[in-house]
Amino acid sequence: DEQTRILGVKGASQECDCDFVGSGDTVIDPILLTWYKDTYVMDPVEKRGFDGNLWRWEYPAANGSYMVVADVARGDGSDYSACHVIEVTNATQVAEYKGKVDTKDFGNFLVNLSTEYNDALLVVENSNIGWACIQQCIDRDYKNLFYMSKDLKYVDVEHQMKNKYRADEKQMVAGFSTTSKTRPLIISKLDEYFREKAVTIRSNRLIDELFTFIFMNGRAEAMKSYNDDLVMALCIGLWVRDTALRLRQEGIDLTKRTLGGISSNQQYEGVYGGSNMDDNPWKMKIGDDIEDLTQWL
């Protein structure tokens, strides 16, 4: 039914039937993950960075549209800071980072990476220590930082830092907020993309995380002693791509359709145009008669 199409079999069972998936059941079907691993996963063409943990599969194309999506480590040493570079048009993973790095250094790294990929839309998860990373991006005056409203009514994907003090933007916050409201949405979006095979994943590290990304007491999270940093960054990226960027594109398309509906050869009735004008500009049809305007000169 419609709920199954939107949320997936597992999501619909939890949402509609209160049938919470048993602990240990993976969020993404392992058979599907194996298909992805056999079909798309490949070694990166380059490994670079101070720790060699930036993996790249594609270099930035001249006219490519990209987004960089990051999940910042909590700072307790048990997880990693991670990010993906996603080609927006085809939802293709072109680069990935996973490592342990200071939040300020990670902020600088994200700005540099986003700039390299054609000033990509930079989306940073802003919970907890993520704010320190975002502040570094703001201090660097990065112009394409993602903002969203606190109540999630809308997102502003074209927000410029020079406008950050405008009164009508006081409720805008930098970064993406993973809350009890947004978390089910982004995980559902992850499941949807994989079920429809609408995203191209190159990273073996990410697929390995997805194999251990399970339902535990009704909540999707990493299995004990494993991490889900790459998974959560991808969840956010797919939601932003499918929601915020799609809405912006629909607005652009609507503008094009509106402008295209305006005809340039329409004739309007009036003093200086329309059917009351004769071929001779000095003659005008008045009622049933043609009057010579030169007599008034």
Question: Where in this protein do the model-derived segments appear?
Answer:
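Binuclear metal-ion centers of metallo-dependent hydrolases, dominated by the metallo-beta-lactamase
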Residues: 154
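Surface-exposed intrinsically disordered loops and tails
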Residues: 157-174
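Amphipathic alpha-helical blocks and their helix-capping loop/short-beta junctions
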Residues: 174-180
